[in-house]
């Protein structure tokens, strides 16, 4: 928010959509009351009249955001290396963000929500609000925005793009084709938040690491090794598994380094257990009551924690078993039936018709599975929204895993048709990339164009004019017409990163689990990912609204899914090698086949061994964390000892005075 001359640059970061006024301004107009209350809070409000709605653009100076952060007790890292609740008076002691601002995008949006939703009727009596002849009551102590939302006055509230930073990111990132995988990660984090910043860092690192298996796969696919040809595929298989295991371990190190660089502590905040017990860290007795009650309450607290923990585990386990059994009993027979019918049909026209019917049914089943998963998750006990989102990822990925790979397994294990398998892999890698690129680029733009067209047509009908072109001049109205960055499944828990991460995980599983059948797939994936970085960047900066920030700073459940796919790759590629070398189909344990089985077990051991050999955190991150924890413990212990000493002196001082008085007499 800093201007070029050292003055604070006013940036409208939040917009609210309200109805366009039909009647003349009247006393008690609810929109006027909202604008007045926002300005009383110290915020800057700009009113923009659009075609069918009015827009309130809201900005908050740094001082106002700082006061809100202090009220929210937002913990921030200080220059001493200790995370402390923010206080505006000591703002210079807190570390600033990479873009020079005091608060991250996630923290600023939290402050905006606190300020806007914190407007309550503190007058002690009800207030009558009006809108175009309609009246409703704003009761004492009620949130104004909640009331306006329930009455349909506030249509939407969404974050706005910062035009200056957006254009800078367009030049340095989305349109900078010379840097294939190098991205301004700090700028992405500052503008979009930690979740999107971590995703693009992961995508860039994954694309860079793909260069090695892409070159190796190109050599294996194109070069004839003569008498040593039978060793080419097993060697390539071993190399790709070791590459994948090392990549995931080094990604954990990079993720830890990013969190340390951005001063993000993932462990901040009380756990669900304390909320379950009716306790918060801020409500714990301190310090004399804590010492007195600690021994009495420890047994009860432990018992309550155990009941809560196992009850939550039991509900999650029940839902997971239900989802797995549904996939096995319902989706697996359907996928096998489609693969079998597709294999025996000879007419290409019937195959296309069958595929179209299959895709329609699959879309319905996937959306149905997503809705069922969300309902099951709502009945679980999860510590946060991110835990619920991870639970959704596991359940929905099971559906997509069955859809994507069961037909390929059918071709491999039953028909052993490697030519058909390669054709299927090429088609899915190329067609899926073209499909996802078209969906990412064209679908949001088509939605945006259709909404603009509908608004213009409605305006022409209201004005009664059939000639002349109606222009949309305001930037905020253009952003209002843009679609949101939302997930195709489970929009209550996930945003558009779900679809992007799902696409990447399915691609990784495709090239890894069938690496021996088509080594050139890694090269296709590398080229695809370079395009993916640019298309996703353009999508976020041009065709979509600015996404809502999320607190998560890791790729979450997707890391476990990638590790699962590595283990599956060891098993599937071993099966591919067995099918390739067992040409007679007798499944005899000959020396070659026995060597493949031994290699499979060795690779499984190496995969888990590498996770122990390569530390998940760089040494400097670990040392910095230990230093910060030590400093925090020292300061807390000194404060606790001073408090106990003060209370002890206050208790013993009257006794000493009485003793001195008795000695005098």
Curated annotation (Swiss-Prot):
Q: What are the GO MF terms of this UniProt record?
A: chloride channel activity
Membrane topology recorded in Swiss-Prot or TrEMBL: Multi-pass membrane protein
Keywords from UniProt, A to Z, are: Calcium, Chloride, Chloride channel, Ion channel, Ion transport, Membrane, Transmembrane, Transmembrane helix, Transport
* InterPro entries in UniProt: Anoctamin (IPR007632), Anoctamin_TM (IPR049452)
Q: Provide the transmembrane region boundaries.
A: 200-220, 230-250, 322-342, 344-364, 392-412, 508-528, 551-571, 591-611
What Pfam families is this protein classified in? Anoctamin (PF04547)
Q: Subcellular localization, per the record?
A: Membrane
The terms describing its cellular component in GO are: chloride channel complex
Which protein family is it in? Belongs to the anoctamin (TC 1.A.17) family.
Protein's job: May act as a calcium-activated chloride channel.
Q: What is this protein called?
A: Anoctamin-like protein At1g73020
Which species? Arabidopsis thaliana (Mouse-ear cress)
């Amino acid at each position: 928010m800093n201007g070029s001359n050292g003055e604070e640059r006013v940036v409208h970061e939040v917009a609210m959509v309200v109805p366009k006024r039909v009647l003349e301004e009247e006393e008690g107009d609810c929109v006027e009351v909202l604008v007045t209350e926002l300005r009383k809070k110290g915020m800057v409000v700009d009113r923009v009249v659009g075609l069918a709605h009015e827009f309130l653009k809201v900005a908050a100076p740094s001082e106002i955001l700082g006061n809100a952060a202090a009220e929210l007790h937002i913990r921030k890292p200080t220059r001493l290396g200790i995370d402390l609740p923010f206080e505006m008076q000591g703002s210079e002691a807190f570390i600033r963000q990479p873009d020079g601002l005091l608060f991250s995008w996630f923290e600023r949006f939290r402050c905006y929500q606190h300020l806007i939703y914190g407007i309550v009727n503190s007058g002690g009596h009800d207030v009558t609000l009006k809108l175009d002849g309609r009246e409703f009551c704003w009761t004492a102590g009620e949130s104004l925005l909640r009331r306006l939302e329930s009455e349909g006055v506030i249509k939407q509230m969404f974050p706005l793009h910062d035009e200056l930073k957006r254009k800078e990111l367009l030049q340095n990132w989305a349109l900078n084709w010379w840097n294939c995988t190098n991205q301004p990660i700090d700028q992405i984090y500052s503008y979009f938040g930690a979740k999107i910043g971590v995703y693009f860092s992961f995508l860039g690192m994954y694309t860079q690491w793909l260069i090695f298996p892409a070159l190796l796969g190109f050599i294996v696919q194109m070069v004839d090794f003569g008498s040593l040809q039978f060793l080419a595929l097993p060697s390539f298989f071993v190399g790709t598994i070791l590459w994948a295991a090392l990549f995931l371990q080094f990604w954990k190190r990079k993720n830890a380094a990013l969190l340390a660089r951005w001063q993000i502590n993932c462990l901040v905040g009380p756990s669900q257990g304390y909320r379950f017990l009716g306790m918060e860290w801020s409500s714990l007795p301190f310090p004399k009551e804590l010492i007195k009650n600690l021994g009495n309450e420890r047994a009860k607290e432990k018992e309550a924690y155990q009941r809560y923990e196992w009850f939550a585990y039991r509900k999650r386990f029940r839902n997971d078993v239900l989802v797995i059994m549904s996939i096995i009993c319902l989706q697996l027979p359907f996928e096998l039936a489609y693969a079998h019918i597709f294999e025996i049909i000879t007419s290409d026209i019937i195959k296309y018709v069958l595929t179209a019917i299959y895709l329609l049914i699959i879309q319905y089943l996937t959306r149905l599975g997503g809705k069922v998963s969300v309902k099951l998750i709502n009945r679980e006990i999860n510590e946060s929204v991110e835990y619920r989102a991870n639970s959704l990822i596991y359940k929905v990925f099971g559906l997509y895993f069955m859809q994507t790979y069961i037909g390929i397994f059918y071709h491999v294990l039953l028909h052993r048709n490697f030519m058909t398998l390669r054709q299927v892999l090429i088609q899915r890698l190329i067609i899926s990339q073209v499909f996802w690129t078209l969906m990412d680029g064209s679908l949001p733009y088509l939605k945006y164009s259709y909404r603009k067209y509908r608004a213009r047509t409605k305006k022409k009908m209201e004005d009664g004019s059939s000639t002349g072109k109606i222009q949309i001049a305001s930037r905020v109205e253009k952003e209002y017409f843009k679609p949101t960055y939302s997930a195709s499944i489970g929009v209550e828990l996930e945003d558009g990163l779900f679809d992007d991460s799902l696409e990447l995980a399915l691609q990784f599983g495709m090239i890894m689990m069938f690496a021996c059948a088509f080594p050139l797939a890694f090269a296709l994936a590398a080229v695809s990912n370079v395009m993916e970085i640019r298309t996703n960047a353009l999508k976020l900066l041009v065709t979509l609204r600015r996404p809502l920030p999320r607190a998560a700073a890791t790729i979450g459940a997707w890391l476990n899914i990638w590790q699962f796919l590595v283990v599956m790759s060891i098993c599937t590629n071993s099966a591919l090698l067995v099918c390739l070398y067992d040409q007679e189909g007798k499944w005899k344990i000959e020396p070659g086949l026995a060597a493949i089985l031994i290699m499979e077990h060795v690779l499984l051991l190496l995969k888990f061994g590498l996770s122990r050999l390569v530390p998940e955190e760089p040494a400097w991150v670990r040392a910095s964390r230990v230093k910060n924890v030590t400093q925090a413990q020292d300061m807390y212990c000194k404060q606790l000892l001073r408090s106990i000493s003060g209370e002890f002196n206050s208790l013993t001082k009257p006794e000493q005075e009485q003793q001195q008085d008795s000695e005098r007499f």
